[in-house]
Amino acid sequence: MPMRKRHFYRLLPLASLLLAACTIPVSKGPATSPTSPQWRQHEQQLQQLGQFETRGAFAYLSDKQKVYARFFWQQTSPERYRLLLTNPLGSTELELVVQPGVTQLTDNQGKRYVSDDPQEMIQKLTGMSIPLESLRQWILGLPGDTPNFTLDDKYRLKKLTYQQNGVTWVVNYQEYNTQVTPPLPSRLELNQDGQRIKLKMDSWTIK
């Protein structure tokens, strides 16, 4: 019996080592880096999406105001798009039509405004700071002009940080729609100095 006990205790450290080896996380290495071929392929697929539509829920949250709406985004070419915000009753709160060199905004009273800077116009008229030029890329899961981004284990955008004119936006991708090809974001959140923009895409139509 004593010899059996010694034999038993001698096996315990070996078993512990085997269990520890099984629980050591495997490093993914450079596979999910921005230079990986899988990301490059996914990025190229996204860049080819010249026409698409998506609709869902929009929330803008800051210390000064909270806005909840339904949204419809229609992209007809890389430089032409339409953004529609509606209230829970389905009435239009804001319609933005962007074309090269000119932007037209129609408010909930039917009054129209024209500008060459959609982001500045929305901020002046609604108080909401929305980085529209970058959002056109971010909504698809593209990093746009920033090199500061990370990928998830499926080689899709996970998080990005964008800085311009002293303003820093951090975008987190929380969920993807894998029912479309290529997979497209279904939930993302933008943060900038106390401001949050939440987008939940209920559907995508690729043309």
UniProtKB/Swiss-Prot annotation:
Primary location class: membrane
Bilayer topology annotation: Lipid-anchor
GO biological process, one term: lipoprotein localization to outer membrane
Lipid attachment, kind S-diacylglycerol cysteine: C22
TM region(s), chain numbering: none
Key words of the record: Cell outer membrane, Chaperone, Lipoprotein, Membrane, Palmitate, Protein transport, Signal, Transport
Localization terms from the record: Cell outer membrane
Keyword presence, Signal: yes
Pfam families found in the cross-reference section: LolB
Domain of life: Bacteria
Residues bearing a lipid moiety (N-palmitoyl cysteine): C22
CDD domains: LolB (cd16326)
Any one of the GO CC terms: cell outer membrane
InterPro entries: LolA/LolB/LppX, OM_lipoprot_LolB
The keyword Transmembrane helix appears for this protein: no
Signal peptide span: 1-21
Subunit text: Monomer.
Role of this protein: Plays a critical role in the incorporation of lipoproteins in the outer membrane after they are released by the LolA protein.
Protein family per UniProt: Belongs to the LolB family.
Protein name: Outer-membrane lipoprotein LolB
Gene name of the record: lolB
